[in-house]
């Protein structure tokens, strides 16, 4: 009898598996399926004529890796607003509103870090110091402490490197801003754009250079920015909110599924598709949309993606692990005393 039940269970599982519809990633069928579910988010096309190998390459964060020391709780007695947007709280800090482009490289772990570090330097100096911290410097020089460069890395290692070795300035690709601007070119997700197409895996990790680009002053060593401490934030909705409210944006990481690639608006919740990989982003606020609490975050897939590069994701339920991998830190303030 038990053998018969086992056969029936297997047949039932097989039938259920066959009944779950499969939609190719990046397809119109997947977009239509997500939108028909009428959830809190809306889907659309962010990647046109783009290889899935390129998209998988973008998700370059190793989840569950080395953890930064966790800071103590301090949110219990804080009165936090229902909505908070660091772009509005610190309007004189331009990096908070910036969307970067990691190009064909799994460097999201580095981008999430340098973006939040740039923001925090401005926040902690009361907007007296505004700098784009170099993703190139972190990506190319951190080495195995951070992971494998364009083949993936650890957010905790990125923040530790900032405190121990420091990071120079550096803007977007071909910007010639700062000591070491990003050297991996952006690519075009859309059909009719000015960038080259996004194809293949590509994305060789740039060579570490401890020299600024010609004509830039001060020197590489003199241009370094340091953190005094880096830490993990407890896996608590209120603790993460308090951290952002007090110190500015943080770096977070989560599991990307195929439906996230199609995000266009609303509050993202995973409803369809398989895992693509781990991805790091910058969380810069929170809010409530039509009764659904969300985190406000910045991606590094250029302004074509999502809401001009930004997105909202379900808050308070550790959705896709978004609240489990929060890392942050505080700048070493004495290096800025002459300017604040």
From Swiss-Prot:
Catalytic reaction(s) noted: Hydrolysis of proteins with broad specificity for peptide bonds. Preferentially cleaves -Arg-Arg-|-Xaa bonds in small molecule substrates (thus differing from cathepsin L). In addition to being an endopeptidase, shows peptidyl-dipeptidase activity, liberating C-terminal dipeptides
EC number: 3.4.22.1
Record's signal peptide: 1-17
Catalytic machinery residues: 108, 279, 299
Broad class of the protein's primary localization: other
Enzyme class: hydrolase
Disulfide bonds: 93-122, 105-150, 141-208, 142-146, 179-212, 187-198
GO cellular component, one term: lysosome
The UniProt record lists the keyword ATP-binding: no
GO terms for biological process, alphabetical: apoptotic process involved in morphogenesis; proteolysis involved in protein catabolic process
Location of the protein in the cell: Lysosome
Glycan attachment residues as annotated in the record: 38, 192
Superkingdom in the source lineage: Eukaryota
Cited function: Thiol protease which is believed to participate in intracellular degradation and turnover of proteins. Has also been implicated in tumor invasion and metastasis.
Oligomer status and interactors: Dimer of a heavy chain and a light chain cross-linked by a disulfide bond.
Family, similarity comment: Belongs to the peptidase C1 family.
PANTHER family recorded: CYSTEINE PROTEASE FAMILY C1-RELATED (PTHR12411)
Name recorded for this polypeptide: Cathepsin B
Organism: Gallus gallus
Lineage of the species this protein comes from: Eukaryota, Metazoa, Chordata, Craniata, Vertebrata
Gene giving rise to this polypeptide: CTSB
